[in-house]
Amino acid sequence: MGERSGKRELPLLPLRGLLVYPTMVLHLDVGREKSIRALEQAMVDDNKILLATQEEVHIEEPDAEQIYSIGTVARVKQMLKLPNGTIRVLVEGLQRAKIEEYLQKEDYFVVSITYLKEEKAEENEVEALMRSLLTHFEQYIKLSKKVSPETLTSVQDIEEPGRLADVIASHLPLKMKDKQEILETVNIQERLEILLTILNNEREVLELERKIGNRVKKQMERTQKEYYLREQMKAIQKELGDKDGRQGEVDELRAQLEKSDAPERIKAKIEKELERLEKMPSTSAEGSVIRTYIDTLFALPWTKTTEDNLDIKHAEEVLDEDHYGLEKPKERVLEYLAVQKLVNSMRGPILCLVGPPGVGKTSLARSVARALGREFVRISLGGVRDEAEIRGHRRTYVGALPGRIIQGMKQAGTINPVFLLDEIDKLASDFRGDPASALLEVLDPNQNDKFSDHYIEETYDLTNVMFITTANSLDTIPRPLLDRMEVISISGYTELEKLNILRGYLLPKQMEDHGLGKDKLQMNEDAMLKLVRLYTREAGVRNLNREAANVCRKAAKIIVGGEKKRVVVTAKTLEALLGKPRYRYGLAEKKDQVGSVTGLAWTQAGGDTLNVEVSILAGKGKLTLTGQLGDVMKESAQAAFSYIRSRASEWGIDPEFHEKNDIHIHVPEGAIPKDGPSAGITMATALVSALTGIPVKKEVGMTGEITLRGRVLPIGGLKEKCMSAHRAGLTTIILPKDNEKDIEDIPESVREALTFYPVEHLDEVLRHALTKQPVGDKK
């Protein structure tokens, strides 16, 4: 290669992503065939070659138009062939040059060039620019960790302004476009100004990076170690090309959304929340709130159901297997099944089981679920006084949660569970709201298809749910709420029912739990009856179950201790196991008594006899009532007393008896409060007997309310009262005529052992109760 009309011919080496300034010495790795041949040609001539940068890095075989026209003439100082076929070259930049013409393009590029001479500028201007450039470069080095401090020392020794600009530019991480601009600028002052502007921008960027770094550092110091680790993990994932944690989480939730059976409105809601979540940093507290909300919507059943088992015989078997008696609620469930089988679209009933503790209300609801083949959910409402417990909290509150209804549906996993609202009569209200009012929507079949929970902010359909509520009393349930439920009363178990429950359910279960087979423990009928009568007094069977467990524990101790291999419990040996009887029941009088009548009472624990005693004392007409009587019972005594005064002469009683005598009415067991109107005819009969001296038949028990005109009004609890009369040894029952229809509710064995006298007036009561009829002046 040589000179031609003031121009120089040189081989061309196109550079990718690299630019060489004059005076620069650096290594290059050359791998392209054309480039290797250009190097070989340079070594044949005078070791000179033109280094020019191609515009696009990714082009393997660039054309002349894709190579910058200005480059640097360099001297090849050393060549080393590497094992992989590439050549490592040590080059030194000499001078700027411009490509005038491409002389050869086939085997390698040969170009005609002209050298570019630097244009001088005003010395003072250049000197000022050089100083400013050095100052800015020094600040840049302090801020940047990419340039070593030793570089500043070597740069400060450079006196030529053009070389200074080239050396500083070579140490800056500039874009290729900016580097090429500096290379193409031959005017020294312009080159310094361009570089100063670029360096100033770089320094400002580094200042901003430093401020951001300090701010991030302070923020990281205030947060937990977990934040720092997550940031590191995020940076690592970014470097590896992985998706960051938040995006991966959102993608996972979107995949879950595709498979969800939620309605379109719910899917749209979830998608909107996902868009919000996507824009939030992984450490955002709001992000975790949104994630919890989305998880709640996913967890709720929207269409999943369990198929009802509509086999009535199967349902009847399951209900009878789990519970003895309880005919009314069982019958209602079977009716629902029958209608469901015919219609196949009936909404679930809303039942309210009312009765004393321990009669099986809660366990019956569980049995209903088993009979229907549905999921069972129970929530206790006892003591709940916050409306948010039912409807949930709005998501703006910290720690917000859905209400118990929605949580119960999540737990069920289906849209048609049996949902038990236990102890609905124990709801309370205060300044936080009235939960009973919130339940109005839940328990209304015409409204609960759009139940609104504050947390999920969307309506939820409860029409397929079978709601069952339980209560001990209806008195505390608000009227609008009670109106929405079908009330089924469950009275306390009779003695006979308890005996059957003990024999068929409780004792076998306790024997199994205590590892006692029939060959190890046997309890006869008399012992069971004694256990029911004298060791428990309750409407339900919870204490009876405990006493059965007590018997099993005592028997287990005897057997394990080696005293006996088999324990037989009789009425006599029961006391040895459980101690003295804890309760006693009233018994019939042993002989006919004057002024003493056996009444019949009903309590939450069942029926019992109630003796009423009357004494006539000399005095001035004072009426004394003792035995801890309630207001209603006192009024009944006064009504009976007034009625007897009005008819005293007809029964042979001194019309002036109330002026000459004090009358004392006493009901024994004074420590026990007593109230109610049903002892009215009992007290009236006792008064007539005491005033006439005619005894009352010992086998008679009675119940009924009395009026001032002697009429007998109906009462409640006849079944339990007659059971207690039978237990006490009574054989005759006097009852109001209006209660005659209730006789059929009494167990047949008891009904056949008793003689019933329905009455409408006190005269009829006296006719059946006294040993002889009082005789006086008839009007």
From Swiss-Prot:
EC number(s) on file: 3.4.21.53
Catalytic reaction annotation: Hydrolysis of proteins in presence of ATP
Domain Lon N-terminal: 10-203
Broad class of the protein's primary localization: cytoplasm
Residue numbers binding ATP: 355-362
Cited SMART domains: AAA, LON
Record-annotated Lon proteolytic domain positions: 591-772
Induction: By heat shock.
Record's keyword terms, sorted: ATP-binding, Cytoplasm, Hydrolase, Nucleotide-binding, Protease, Serine protease, Stress response
One cellular-component annotation, GO: cytoplasm
Annotated GO biological process: cellular response to heat; protein quality control for misfolded or incompletely synthesized proteins
Active-site residues, Swiss-Prot/TrEMBL: 678, 721
Molecular function via GO: ATP binding; ATP hydrolysis activity; ATP-dependent peptidase activity; sequence-specific DNA binding; serine-type endopeptidase activity
Enzyme class, first EC level, given as a word: hydrolase
CDD domains, alphabetized: RecA-like_Lon (cd19500)
Cellular compartments annotated: Cytoplasm
Domain of life the protein comes from: Bacteria
InterPro entries: AAA+_ATPase, ATPase_AAA_core, Lon_bac, Lon_bac/euk-typ, Lon_lid, Lon_proteolytic, Lon_Prtase, Lon_prtase_N
Oligomer and partners: Homohexamer. Organized in a ring with a central cavity.
Summary of the function given for this chain in its UniProt record: ATP-dependent serine protease that mediates the selective degradation of mutant and abnormal proteins as well as certain short-lived regulatory proteins. Required for cellular homeostasis and for survival from DNA damage and developmental changes induced by stress. Degrades polypeptides processively to yield small peptide fragments that are 5 to 10 amino acids long. Binds to DNA in a double-stranded, site-specific manner.
Matching NCBIfam families: lon, PRK10787.1
Family of the protein in this entry: Belongs to the peptidase S16 family.
Name this protein carries in UniProt: Lon protease
Native species: Brevibacillus choshinensis
Gene (name only): lon
